[in-house]
Amino acid sequence: MSVDDLPPSSASAVTPLGSSVIPIVNKLQDIFAQLGSQSTIALPQVAVVGSQSSGKSSVLEALVGRDFLPRGNDICTRRPLRLQLVQTKPSSDGGSDEEWGEFLHHDPVRRIYDFSEIRREIEAETNRVSGENKGVSDIPIGLKIFSPNVLDISLVDLPGITKVPVGDQPSDIEARIRTMILTYIKEPSCLILAVSPANTDLANSDALQIAGNADPDGHRTIGVITKLDIMDRGTDARNHLLGKTIPLRLGYVGVVNRSQEDILMNRSIKDALVAEEKFFRSRPVYSGLTDRLGVPQLAKKLNQVLVQHIKALLPSLKSRINNALFATAKEYESYGDITESRGGQGALLLSFITKYCEAYSSTLEGKSKEMSTSELSGGARILYIFQSVFVKSLEEVDPCEDLTADDIRTAIQNATGPRSALFVPDVPFEVLVRRQISRLLDPSLQCARFIFDELVKISHQCMMKELQRFPVLQKRMDEVIGNFLREGLEPSQAMIRDLIEMEMDYINTSHPNFIGGTKAVEQAMQTVKSSRIPHPVARPRDTVEPERTASSGSQIKTRSFLGRQANGIITDQAVPTAADAERPAPAGSTSWSGFSSIFRGSDGQAAAKNNLLNKPFSETTQEVYQNLSTIYLKEPPTILKSSETHSEQESVEIEITKLLLKSYYDIVRKNVEDLVPKAIMHFLVNYTKRELHNVFIEKLYRENLIEELLKEPDELAIKRKRTQETLRILQQANRTLDELPLEAESVERGYKIGSEAKHEELPGTRRSRTETNGNGRLHM
């Protein structure tokens, strides 16, 4: 005999599909209920949604077969009710079967056989949290109903959607209830039982509207049409039940509720089910829809759909529980065990120090287990700073970029003093090269600072997660290594300064890589020749008339009263020497005629000459000085600079100095590029790596500090206890899933979640007879 051949009141007694699957999920719900709002794993369940007074409560009571829910004209369900229906075995002696309820908030859990008491407990628990004046809360109530007359189903009865606030309800009560409902039904693991009354337009159903928001394709929504017996005359719900109005993948089921008069008359649900069957048989319009009509068919459909829904979700459910178990176990491990003995605390502190130092050393050496593959880290960053930042920056510097030709010529002239130099002096070269060497100090010190900053970053990265439970120890370790790194930075910077000063103190021109003077002169001459520097053009006052200078010779030129350049220094006027004044001019010389022309003019030139030749020398000289006025010198300017033009010899000297500077600077630069990283590695990096463990032992591993360092904050103890409880619950849930038999392969494979499922494969919609093949597999 098939299920369809049974009377409606007996349909619930049929052995349900997945009789071991739903109890497992119910057990998981009980397990995760211990976590309360902390539970992040959504279990398969059926959420009942509908507007206020849509008949939700009547449907649930019909599924249970007993009156147990609060009743009234106003909103009755003010907290979510997690309802687990558990089928028990019928009594073997033919006596009355026991039915009872258990509330999960009771500790210890006790059986309640009086369903009126169950109703009162629901009301009391609702008032305890939501208040007595129609307040609403999202904290669920857990209730189990044990009966041989039910199928294994897990439901969540949600508050009805209301429009107008009453009592203490806020003005936005509708929005709050809708938000609460969506938090449940938005989960893909939740089936939606959308309850809509038949005496209202289905297109305006609040239940279908909110279900459509969470399940727009209708893949996990079951429609329930209530109050079919009070529809207007001449109307029926056949098109609704066939899904022609609003299609749903899981279809619709129509039911007849008890009226308010039936409830007041204490009409039993058993009698109501008989009346419901009689109603459908008396309505020819509903013929051929027996698998879509009545509470027994609804119970069977819910059972079948829920079982297959659970089967489809089991793999992902196991995966989520395992992932949560792994993450929670790792978190609990990070909190560590409670160590109260002094010896145990000392060993724990020593283990922290050792682990930290090993992590620090491994990170520097590139042996860390947590090495990044997306970016450079640890010692690789230090090498990058040495090669790609420090060395590259020094190689890009031109030692002569801030030295002009005038700077070099001025240095050469200053080095010669009052004498003219026959060769390029070495003093200006040393002065200039020292100045360029000193420029290497700042980038070298900056390189050491960069490495220090990298070591500080590494020290922070090596802080183990276990240290979070000891904030005092973590802070002290951070302080110790910070001070220790600074202590290593100081000698490394001092060594860098010494290296630069050593290079400045001794200019080794005998270095085998130094260009040398001979080669420098050759290159300088070639450079000057190729540049074709024109000869300097003398200013007008520096020029002597050709006819007066033709026979004077070089001696007359160098002793001319006219303006000249002495040792490259510009002077403003010519000054005669005593020798010039006393020495007679050679025959044919024009010096004196030039000298007299400056002071006496050209008209008296011949007379003055004859007069001088006819007088004795002493008389002539005395007369000359008597006739000449006193000559006053201009004071030299405060700052003297080289002339704007320079000779070919000066160009060669400048070019030689530049070549010598570049050659020796390259030697020093290479020395600095090699020695500065070595100094930093020796005094800072390797020193801290070698001595860090000893420093921690010296600074922290003290008997009078251990207890203070290993003191846990109060909130950490709370976290450890909560995590331990979560771990226990997840382990229990994992063991519960392991108890699940291989029934997943024994149910119909037609039910799928997603767009691949087809309407014609729905269980309980076309074929309801259960057949078993030779392999023991079930087919619907």
UniProtKB/Swiss-Prot annotation:
<feature type="domain" description="Dynamin-type G">
    <location>
        <begin position="40"/>
        <end position="315"/>
    </location>
</feature>
<dbReference type="InterPro" id="IPR020850">
    <property type="entry name" value="GED_dom"/>
</dbReference>
<keyword id="KW-0007">Acetylation</keyword>
<dbReference type="GO" id="GO:0003924">
    <property type="term" value="F:GTPase activity"/>
</dbReference>
<comment type="function">
    <text>Involved in the control of mitochondrial and peroxisomal division and morphology.</text>
</comment>
<feature type="region of interest" description="G4 motif">
    <location>
        <begin position="226"/>
        <end position="229"/>
    </location>
</feature>
<feature type="region of interest" description="G1 motif">
    <location>
        <begin position="50"/>
        <end position="57"/>
    </location>
</feature>
<feature type="compositionally biased region" description="Polar residues">
    <location>
        <begin position="771"/>
        <end position="780"/>
    </location>
</feature>
<feature type="compositionally biased region" description="Basic and acidic residues">
    <location>
        <begin position="539"/>
        <end position="548"/>
    </location>
</feature>
<feature type="region of interest" description="Disordered">
    <location>
        <begin position="753"/>
        <end position="780"/>
    </location>
</feature>
<dbReference type="GO" id="GO:0005739">
    <property type="term" value="C:mitochondrion"/>
</dbReference>
<keyword id="KW-0547">Nucleotide-binding</keyword>
<dbReference type="GO" id="GO:0007031">
    <property type="term" value="P:peroxisome organization"/>
</dbReference>
<dbReference type="InterPro" id="IPR001401">
    <property type="entry name" value="Dynamin_GTPase"/>
</dbReference>
<dbReference type="InterPro" id="IPR019762">
    <property type="entry name" value="Dynamin_GTPase_CS"/>
</dbReference>
<feature type="domain" description="GED">
    <location>
        <begin position="654"/>
        <end position="745"/>
    </location>
</feature>
<dbReference type="GO" id="GO:0051301">
    <property type="term" value="P:cell division"/>
</dbReference>
<feature type="region of interest" description="G2 motif">
    <location>
        <begin position="76"/>
        <end position="78"/>
    </location>
</feature>
<feature type="binding site">
    <location>
        <begin position="157"/>
        <end position="161"/>
    </location>
    <ligand>
        <name>GTP</name>
    </ligand>
</feature>
<dbReference type="Pfam" id="PF00350">
    <property type="entry name" value="Dynamin_N"/>
</dbReference>
<dbReference type="InterPro" id="IPR000375">
    <property type="entry name" value="Dynamin_stalk"/>
</dbReference>
<feature type="modified residue" description="N-acetylserine">
    <location>
        <position position="2"/>
    </location>
</feature>
<dbReference type="GO" id="GO:0005525">
    <property type="term" value="F:GTP binding"/>
</dbReference>
<feature type="region of interest" description="Disordered">
    <location>
        <begin position="573"/>
        <end position="592"/>
    </location>
</feature>
<dbReference type="GO" id="GO:0005777">
    <property type="term" value="C:peroxisome"/>
</dbReference>
<feature type="region of interest" description="G3 motif">
    <location>
        <begin position="157"/>
        <end position="160"/>
    </location>
</feature>
<keyword id="KW-0496">Mitochondrion</keyword>
<protein>
    <recommendedName>
        <fullName>Dynamin-related protein 3B</fullName>
    </recommendedName>
</protein>
<dbReference type="InterPro" id="IPR027417">
    <property type="entry name" value="P-loop_NTPase"/>
</dbReference>
<feature type="region of interest" description="G5 motif">
    <location>
        <begin position="256"/>
        <end position="259"/>
    </location>
</feature>
<dbReference type="InterPro" id="IPR045063">
    <property type="entry name" value="Dynamin_N"/>
</dbReference>
<keyword id="KW-0131">Cell cycle</keyword>
<feature type="region of interest" description="Disordered">
    <location>
        <begin position="536"/>
        <end position="558"/>
    </location>
</feature>
<dbReference type="Pfam" id="PF01031">
    <property type="entry name" value="Dynamin_M"/>
</dbReference>
<keyword id="KW-0576">Peroxisome</keyword>
<keyword id="KW-0505">Motor protein</keyword>
<feature type="compositionally biased region" description="Basic and acidic residues">
    <location>
        <begin position="753"/>
        <end position="770"/>
    </location>
</feature>
<feature type="compositionally biased region" description="Polar residues">
    <location>
        <begin position="549"/>
        <end position="558"/>
    </location>
</feature>
<keyword id="KW-0962">Peroxisome biogenesis</keyword>
<keyword id="KW-0378">Hydrolase</keyword>
<feature type="binding site">
    <location>
        <begin position="50"/>
        <end position="57"/>
    </location>
    <ligand>
        <name>GTP</name>
    </ligand>
</feature>
<comment type="subunit">
    <text>Interacts with ARC5 on peroxisomes and ELM1 on mitochondria.</text>
</comment>
